[in-house]
Amino acid sequence: MSEAHTFHPTVLREYDIRGIVGSTLTAADARAVGRLRHRGRPAAVRKTVCVGYDGRLSSPELEAAMVDGLVACGLHVLRIGLGPTPMLYFATRDREAAAGIMITGSHNPPDYNGIKMMLGKGPVYGRQILDIGAIASKADYVSGEGSSEQLDIKDAYVERLLRDDDGTRDLTIAWDAGNGASGEDPAPPDREVPGKHVLLFDEIDGNFPNHHPDPTVEKNLVDLKAAVAEHGCDIGIGFDGDGDRIGAIDHLGRVVWGDQLVAIYAADVLKSHPGATIIADVKASQTLFDEIARLGGNPLMWKTGHSLLKAKMAETGSPLAGEMSGHIFFADKWYGFDDALYCAVRLIGLVSKLNQPLSELRDRLPDVVNTPETRFQVSEERKFQVVQEVEGRSSRLMAEGADVNDIDGVRVKDADGWWLLRASNTQDVLVARAESGTRRSWERLKGMVVAHWKPPASRPFLRGRRQLH
């Protein structure tokens, strides 16, 4: 029986579907998403869909409801079971399925969960996600007799991951899965890549008892840093909750941030793809874009968001893209989706074959002073108003000699450095950053941000740190 369904107004987001389980996101929502094969385009969707889920406590229930919805509209479902999101992406490509659907809360708090989707080879985002709400509200489905079966794709995924391991010497590596879906099974790199491995928190536990699985927050890397120091590791690798974002530590215990990793990868990729377009999001350090150009590549600044970067890669034929958040995408030898396990294999191979420590690769980039990604809570309406107000001053800023990029918020660059204000597409927050080569100039750029928008007195614009972040 087809019944109209209404989603909570907060769950249909720009890049995915997410909410608080039992409050804004329920099994009924998952089943409604499963009914996506609606009357308006039944011929556009082939019969097979891959479905997977992460290690959150609510994920099995949501996965079962999703499969129920897909089967109810006549689709054949390949259930890949528990594992990281990239394994679901791989299964969808490997089996040439019509779509892939992942139940995952990614790096959100334990009481959250969500749904990431791909249609064919591309991500589902923006208007496509909002369309799901319109379809469900009208009960605009087709009915049919579908089916489902279990698919064990893990061995094939691991084999394909390891095919691009081109290291020439063994390393000592610490791994922190954060009790997320990259632990236990398949856990390929931390058991199959040659070398010595130190494993942290690889038991999958949706309570996340040791630390939150977000390697872009430095406090979540404390245990990994300690393991690197204790065991004399060459590299420390951290994963987020569903294995599509990577964090890294060098042998000195320093964090190698997402944009620094992209610069390291770009040096390798551009050897086989000279002059290629390398994409990074608007939050990334200017040193990354300068380094890509120095290496002979074509740097392209683009909107933040894993779905948006994947789409831009496909449009431009880029072999590499990445975000400051640790979403990194290879399309030179890989499939163009964000896979932290694959990124780990490539990073280990680079350090091994170049016979250089990760710290030296990191230190090729110049020192800068910058803020981390700073978020200020504002209303949904106000966050866009602030950005529009700054955009309205673009002519004056350019007349003063600044370069203004409004591809995603407002990024203003002058002789001293740059500052950014953008509205988050997933939360009621404004995102701000500032970066310069000297502390004095950096203080001036921070003042520019404050002049254009007064942050709350309780949350001053943050102190800087050496090296890009």
Curated annotation (Swiss-Prot):
Pfam families in UniProt: PGM_PMM_I, PGM_PMM_II, PGM_PMM_III, PGM_PMM_IV
Principal EC category: isomerase
Active-site residues, as the UniProt record annotates them: S106
Any GO MF annotation of the entry: magnesium ion binding
A single BP term in Gene Ontology: carbohydrate metabolic process
SUPFAM superfamilies associated with the record: Phosphoglucomutase, C-terminal domain (SSF55957), Phosphoglucomutase, first 3 domains (SSF53738)
Co-factor remark: Binds 1 Mg(2+) ion per subunit.
Family: Belongs to the phosphohexose mutase family.
NCBIfam families: PhglucPhmanMutPgmG (NF046027)
Protein name: Phosphomannomutase
Taxonomic placement: Bacteria, Pseudomonadati, Pseudomonadota, Alphaproteobacteria, Rhodospirillales
Gene this protein is translated from: exoC
